[in-house]
Amino acid sequence: MSSLKKIPSPLVSLLPIVLLVGMLFATIHTFGSDALEGGSQISLLTTTAFCVFIGITFYRVPWKDYELAITNNISGVATAIIILLIIGALSGAWMISGIVPTLIYYGMQIIHPDFFLASTCIICALISVMTGSSWTTIATIGIALMGIGKAQGFNEGWIAGAIISGAYFGDKISPLSETTILASSITDVPLFRHIRYMLITTTPSLIITLIIFTVMGFVIETNSTAHMADFATSLKDTFTITLWLLIVPLVTGILIARKVPSIITLFISTMLAGICAIIFQPDLLREIAGENNIFKGVMMTFYGSTGLDTGNSMLTDLVSTRGMAGMMNTVWLILCAMCFGGAMTASGMLGSITSVFVRFMKGRVSVVASTVCSGLFLNLTTADQYISIILTGNMFRNIYEKKGYENRLLSRTTEDAVTVTSPLIPWNTCGMTQATILNVSTLTYLPYCFFNIISPLMSILVAAIGYKIVKRPVNNPE
C-alpha cells in the first residue's frame, strides 16, 4: 500500500458508522428480538459494502487491502467461534444432564433472595478470577444463577447484569485472563504490576456495584416461598437431582486450575455432561429423541434445540436449550462484524476517526479521557475486544511516552475502556456471545451492568484526582 494514499477525513469516515447505527436501529425496531436472525447481519454487510465503495471509488484503496484486513480479522476470531460452538453444546448438556438443575435446586436453598444479586456478582467474580475467562464463567455457573434468579422472581436484566458485572471484574484482574495478558504485553508492562495498578480503579467500581445490587436486593419484590417451593418440586419431578452431578463442575474447575486450554476444558466438560445425562436422565433423552434411542437424545442435546414439558411454564422456558445450532446466528453476526471492522481499518477510516481523539490530549484528564473514548469507539467499530486492545495500545503508547506518563497508566486505561465495555455492544463478539448464552438481549441487560458502566468513568475520575499517576522524565525509559 502506498504511503501517499489519501486518507478519508473524519467526517467522511463517520458515514459508514452513521449508516450502521441507522440500519441497526431500523432492524431492531422492525424485527425486535428476531433482529439476530439475519437483519443485523445484512446491516453489517451493507455497511461494509458502503465503506469499501467509498474507499475504492474516492480514495483508490485496492481491493486486496480490504481482503487482507477482513481475512486477518476473521482468522483472529476463529478460536472464539470454536469456543462459542462448544459452549452451545455444553449449555445443552449441562442442562439436560441435570447439572444446572441440581445447582439451581441447592442454590435456591442457600442464597437468600435479598442478597441474591450481590451474591451472584461475587460468585461470578471469584470464579472468573480463578478461571481467567468471563465466557466460561457465564456459560457454566452463570446459567445456573440465571435459573436461580428467575425462580426467585428477579427480572432477567438484573440477573444478567449481576452475572456479567462479576464475570468481567474477574476477567479484568485475573493473571490467567487473555485480555489482561494482552493489555500488559502490548504496553510492555509487567503483568502483576499492571494488575496491581488496575485495582485502583477496579476495586471502587466493584464496591459501588455491590452496594447497588445489595440495596436493590431488598427493594425488588421477589417470589413467595411457596412459589419457589413449587419451582423446586417441579425441578425434582423433571430431573434426577443428585450431588453426584456436581462432579462435572468440580472436574471442570480442576482442569481450569491446571490451565488446560479453554477449548479442551469445555469439550471434556461437555462429554462428561453427556455421560451423566445417559446415567441419570435416560427418560429425558428418550423424550428428546422422540423414540427409545438414548444416543440420539444425547446427540440432539449437543447440537439442536430441546424442549421439555415440566408442568411449570417458567421451568419449561428455563430448561429449553438450543445447542450448537443455536449459536449459528451469533457466529454469522461475528463474521459480518469482522468484515465491517476490516473494511474500516483497510480504508483508513478507523485511523482517521481515532486521530481526532489524539488532538484533544493536552493534560492528564484529557489524555485518559481520550484513551477511554478511543477504546470504546474501537469496540464499537471493530466489534472485537482483542483488536481494540491492540489498536489502543499501539496508537497511544508513543503519545503517553512523549507526555511523560507511565505505560501502566495506558495499560490500565485500555482495560477500563475496552475489556469491560465489550459485552455492552450488541454487535461486539462479547455482547453477542453473552446475550446468546444467557438468552437475554444486550440492550436488556446493558442498564444493569453497573461495573462495566462505572469502570471507564472511574478511570477518568481517578485521573482527575491524580491518585498514583506519576509523570516521569519525558525521554527516560521506564
Residue ranges and their predicted role:
Residues 59-150, 309-397:
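Membrane-embedded alpha-helical segments and adjacent helix-loop junctions characteristic
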Residues 153-155, 257-263, 382-383, 440-441:
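Transmembrane helix interruption/hinge and helix-loop junction motifs
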